[in-house]
UniProtKB/Swiss-Prot annotation:
InterPro entries: Domain_X (IPR024937), Maturase_MatK (IPR002866), Maturase_MatK_N (IPR024942). It is found in: Plastid, Chloroplast. This is Maturase K. The keyword Chloroplast applies. Keywords: Chloroplast, mRNA processing, Plastid, RNA-binding, tRNA processing. It comes from the Eukaryota. GO terms for molecular function: RNA binding. It holds the Pfam family MatK_N. Belongs to the intron maturase 2 family. MatK subfamily. The lineage of its organism: Eukaryota, Viridiplantae, Streptophyta, Embryophyta, Tracheophyta.
Length: 516
């Protein structure tokens, strides 16, 4: 990053610098393919036959040259899946290697302006508002929901649609990066990628692209979502009838998320001609990645107006149609919606209050609304089964790929996964699902060690004793056990219901992110 900042200082302001020459810098590809920095602890590093995880600058230059040649894509289409990893020559010409190499390297480059903006914005915030540091945690969204949602009536689950064509994503990026060669290279790459996949799968190009080029796709997609919200706020403030309200935007390198309150609806038949404001002072909006939640104290009809507005907004400004069914409207009470790895709902808790007046006493029945968050067990177990920690039914299995590691590394990996999950799900009011996940990971760790030593999991657990259990504890659980002495000393079997929202989490846990 220091070298990148030095380059940008030599070439002008961050908004007008040229990113294209960075494609020819060796350290860019070292950074792009450094699995120690970019991979998750939940997944094993991807190792390709004939590829040493380091991009040669000569290969990169050849790759850019071959992008403009038709025969590259002919070779890619003719390559079979069986020969994709068979050798360096076939692997170089495979479309998987082509797309991965270009997209990962290019995504690192286009993230540079946003990373610098993030650093500069955080420095300014620390000078002006020192207490705003806690708002960077995505867990700060849940106290916001606890404070605002319990007295509202309706909630709308919104899945922000993907643009039909990748060109929409490039056009959105033009407002952020003013480097014509880089944008031209990106557009040419996406165009060739679309033509290549048209031979294989019809009408699924953007889906295939999102699976094979996750980092670049999420960067482009979140740029588009950020642009949606920017235009949305701009239109809202454009009308003199709409009062200005507080809003906060949170920027991360490849994930954007925001939190706004008191948003006012703008219903438009034609955005270029007429603005018809509809005011709702009790509308709240939160979003993370492609999932947004709208909650209102208004009627069901008002929520339908919101849905109508959003459908027309995407149609007129981004030129694609969004199906209304992607925005479900439900009454907030006793309805559960999935958001950021939690199953959230507003519950009605009945209470009986005893009122004493002189010699007479009587009971008053009252209901209190309470915002509740729990862990969805079945989706999380399904996520664990995808990465081979357990079966689909939740039966723990060994991790063969980790059996060659040392005992310390195996225990450390499982312990980190368990602690990260516990840390992220510390806000759940019911911990039974979390205890089951810990049990699965602990037994999977024991079976992996038993597989390595050609022993049984029971014998290994008896030999290690409580030493293995302590690796799966978090600092929060040890703190709770100290503060609340009634709970058992081992949170794995405890029954405490205390919720803790962490203020140091800037992204969703990777295992949870698979089911969002």
């Amino acid at each position: 990053m220091e070298e990148l900042q030095g380059y940008l200082k030599k070439n002008g302001s961050p908004q007008q610098h040229f990113l294209y020459p960075l494609l020819l810098q060796e350290y860019i590809y070292t950074l792009a393919h450094d699995h120690g920095l970019n991979s998750s602890i939940f997944y094993e590093s991807i190792e390709f036959i004939g590829y040493d995880n380091k991009s040669s600058l000569v290969l990169v230059k050849r790759l850019i040259t071959r992008m403009y040649q038709q025969n590259l894509f002919i070779y890619s289409v003719n390559d079979s899946n069986q020969n994709r990893f068979g050798g360096h020559t076939n692997f170089f010409y495979s479309h998987f290697f082509y797309s991965q190499m270009v997209s990962e390297s290019f995504s690192v480059i286009v993230e540079i302006p946003f990373s610098l903006r993030l650093v500069s914005s955080l420095e300014e915030e620390e000078k002006e508002i020192p207490k705003s540091q806690n708002l960077r945690s995505i867990h700060s969204i849940f106290p916001f929901l606890e404070d605002k949602l319990f007295h509202l009536n309706n909630v709308s689950d919104i899945l922000i649609p993907h643009p039909i064509h990748l060109e929409i994503l490039v056009q959105t990026l033009q407002y952020w990066i003013q480097d014509v060669p880089s944008l031209h290279l990106l557009r040419f790459f996406l165009h060739k990628y679309h033509n290549l996949n048209s031979f294989i799968q019809n009408n699924k190009t953007i889906y295939v692209f999102s699976k094979e080029n996750k980092r670049l796709f999420w960067f482009l997609y979140n740029s588009y979502v950020s642009e949606c919200e920017f235009l949305f706020v701009f239109i809202r403030k454009k009308s003199c009838y709409l009062r200005s309200t507080s809003s906060g935007a949170f920027l991360e390198r490849s994930h954007f998320y925001g939190k706004k309150e008191h948003i006012i609806v703008v219903c438009c038949n034609n955005f270029q001609k007429t603005l018809c404001p509809v005011k709702d002072l009790f509308m709240h909006y939160v979003r993370y990645q492609g999932k947004a939640i709208l909650a209102s104290r208004g009627t069901h009809l008002l929520m339908k107006k919101w849905r109508y507005y959003l459908v027309n907004f995407w149609q007129y400004y981004f030129h694609f149609w969004s199906q209304p069914y992607r925005m479900q409207i439900n009454p907030l009470l006793n309805y559960s919606f999935y958001f950021m790895g939690y199953l959230s709902s507003v519950l009605i808790n009945p209470y009986a209050v005893k009122n004493q007046m002189l010699e007479n006493s009587f009971l008053i029945d009252t209901d209190i609304n309470k915002f509740d968050t729990i862990i969805p067990g079945i989706p999380l177990i399904g996520s664990l089964s995808k990465v081979k920690f357990c079966t689909v039914s939740g039966h723990p299995i060994s991790k063969p790929g980790w059996a060659d590691l040392s005992d310390f590394d195996i225990i450390d990996r499982f312990g980190r996964i368990c602690r990260n999950l516990s840390h992220y799900h510390s806000g759940s009011s019911k911990k039974q699902t979390l205890y089951r996940i810990k049990y699965i990971l602990r037994l999977s760790c024991a079976r992996t060690l038993a597989r390595k030593h050609k022993s049984t999991a029971r014998a290994l657990l008896q030999r290690l004793g409580s030493g293995l259990v302590e690796e799966f504890f978090t600092e929060e659980e040890q703190f709770i056990s100290f503060i609340f002495p009634k709970t058992t000393p081992f949170p794995l079997h405890g029954s405490h219901r205390e919720r803790i929202w962490s203020l140091d989490i800037i992204r969703v846990n990777d295992l949870v992110n698979q089911i969002i």
